[in-house]
Amino acid sequence: MNVLIYNGNGASKICLLRTFQSLLPFVVPLYAMRFVDASTLEKEPWPASTALLVMPGGRDMGYCSSFNETIYRKITDFVKRGGAYLGLCAGGYFGSAVVDFRMPDSDLNVVGKRKLQFFPGTCAGPTFPGFTYDSEDGARRASIIVDGMQSSPVHTHIYFNGGGSFLETENYSNVKVVARYQETDFEKSAAIIYVKVGKGNVVLTGIHPEFSAEGSPILDKRDEKTRLELLSYILKLLGLKVPKDTSKCGQPTLTDQYLFPNNVETKRFIEKALTNKVKNQDEDTLYTFQFSDISSEIPEHQLANLDISADLSDSDNEIVKIWYGDEEKICKKAKPSFDLELYAKLINGCRFGLPIIVAPVIRSTQTLLDKNYRFLDSTNTGFTVLGNYQTAGRGRGQNMWVSPYGTLAFSFIINVDAKNFSTTPIALFQYLMALAVVRGIREYAPGYENIPAFIKWPNDVYVRVDKGGINFQGKQYMKLSGIIVTSNYRKNVLHLVVGCGINVSNLGPTVSLNTLVDEWNKNSDNPRLEKFSFEKLLASVLNQFDRYHRLLLEEGFSLILPEYYQYWLHSNQTVNLASGGKAIIQGITSDFGFLLAQLLNENNEPTTKVVHLQPDGNSFDLMRNLITRKT
């Protein structure tokens, strides 16, 4: 499950950073944390895989100008059905029915109704005078009393800068005051409120519990312990599972990477990478690559770079150190994260999966390959990058997330020469990958064929669960895997980067393969299954992809389609089109992979009109049986 943080028009950069940093220790052990914009909220089926939506501090008017009726409806429905919403300062104003924000200069006043209306009343502010936009001139260490967090009320101080007070909370039976300002009249004292909305939970704040005392001239480090307890309490009110001990949680530091094997192809890759180092540097290159022989303590080579853009904070150029050389030493270094010796035996003969870079902690396997162009130019088909933990993972669209340990995250290269464009059905590769994931799971070993993994068009893998998933055609499903395919055309070669993430051993509440294995093993009548390993699963998936890729190029997609249909969820499904009307899914074209949908009339009877839907232009919302346009 995801925790989404809005990162679009209106969101303050510093508030985004503080929100990310403060929530990370509580969230990432159990959830994936993603940044999303208004387009994502409108067009992606995010509610089905989301536990919490966070609207950070910033400008409420920016949110209003970017959100449309579809977004408001999706957020409201998400909460009413059991989701959670956290509104911090501007996000608190935004979640109220009425905003009454008044400044000494009346031209700066913001007064009016809002559409989410989780709090049925008015959020009035600034609670304290002196606020100035884009400044800390009016910021203060607000004294508050928190009720319900412990057996008796707790006094602490929290960062304040322009936030509001929630008025007349006593008039609403579904509203509970969590914290009150101590330095205001009682009627303006509600600083944090909890609201029950349908089956869901909402917390709105006028203060900034996400701001730590670290580096702050306003806050006192003596309040940090209570601030963290307050954050934990807020997340529990929102229905999230929170680790008891967060001291060992949070985002680990980026690590060195390990290149395997030490063979002729790997050496050619390094030589080519060094040859591609030119004076006229590519503007979009993100990293400095530093290749070091593991037998030597001194780096031997460096590739030039420009600055990093993947970080949330301003930073200098980032160095990515890649060790190569002696296989025994490389395997020993990588083994805590990935057993390269075992993997090499399992992947033998496959065109994909070697050479491989193993990174215990990486920003993104996809970004490393497709946003570093000289590095990309040096790779051959099959070159693979695996990360145990991604701090800025990428999915379909332009959004990033922090993926927790237990996710098998990898990306690999397919190079297509310009002369072969007309005979290479590139659009079908994402279908092959989805099928390879399903078959890689089901053919992991004898007995695993009963793992209920299925394909959701166009590029996701879902598993059937007993409870807690999306109700689809009378059964419950949860997302297990997502796939992304990106491309770069350079020097008469189209470089395709196929990225995939599979939940293998994630901690709850999300589903993972090993939780399915645990459930299977609880039944004594079932033959006992061993838990999935990263090494064996990656080899199984890539071997399957290799088989389908060969078959596609040699025989065509029509021979693969029957097997694809065996595992996809959409045969003869009646769907709603976002453009209006309904249709019945007929299948997929064997040339370009278009989804075929036969339109229905107002009586839900088939017409003669069939529409072709592109996989890269549309998204499937299982929860609502809805196909929407995607950008």
UniProtKB/Swiss-Prot annotation:
The keyword Ligase applies. The keyword Ribosomal protein does not apply. It catalyses: apo-[methylmalonyl-CoA:pyruvate carboxytransferase] + biotin + ATP = holo-[methylmalonyl-CoA:pyruvate carboxytransferase] + AMP + diphosphate + H(+); apo-[propionyl-CoA:carbon-dioxide ligase (ADP-forming)] + biotin + ATP = holo-[propionyl-CoA:carbon-dioxide ligase (ADP-forming)] + AMP + diphosphate + H(+); apo-[3-methylcrotonoyl-CoA:carbon-dioxide ligase (ADP-forming)] + biotin + ATP = holo-[3-methylcrotonoyl-CoA:carbon-dioxide ligase (ADP-forming)] + AMP + diphosphate + H(+); biotin + L-lysyl-[protein] + ATP = N(6)-biotinyl-L-lysyl-[protein] + AMP + diphosphate + H(+). It is found in: Cytoplasm. CDD domains: BPL, GATase1_ScBLP_like. Keywords: ATP-binding, Cytoplasm, Ligase, Multifunctional enzyme, Nucleotide-binding. Signal peptide: none annotated. GO terms for biological process: protein maturation; protein modification process. It is an enzyme of class 6 (ligase). It comes from the Eukaryota. SUPFAM superfamilies: Class I glutamine amidotransferase-like (SSF52317), Class II aaRS and biotin synthetases (SSF55681). InterPro entries: aa-tRNA-synth_II/BPL/LPL, Biotin-prot_ligase_N, Biotin_CoA_COase_ligase, BPL_C, BPL_LPL_catalytic, Class_I_gatase-like. Its EC number is 6.3.4.-, 6.3.4.9, 6.3.4.10, 6.3.4.11. Pfam families: BPL_C, BPL_LplA_LipB, BPL_N. Monomer. Post-translational modification of specific protein by attachment of biotin. Acts on various carboxylases such as acetyl-CoA-carboxylase, pyruvate carboxylase, propionyl CoA carboxylase, and 3-methylcrotonyl CoA carboxylase. PANTHER family: BIOTIN PROTEIN LIGASE (PTHR12835), BIOTIN--PROTEIN LIGASE (PTHR12835:SF5). This is Biotin--protein ligase.
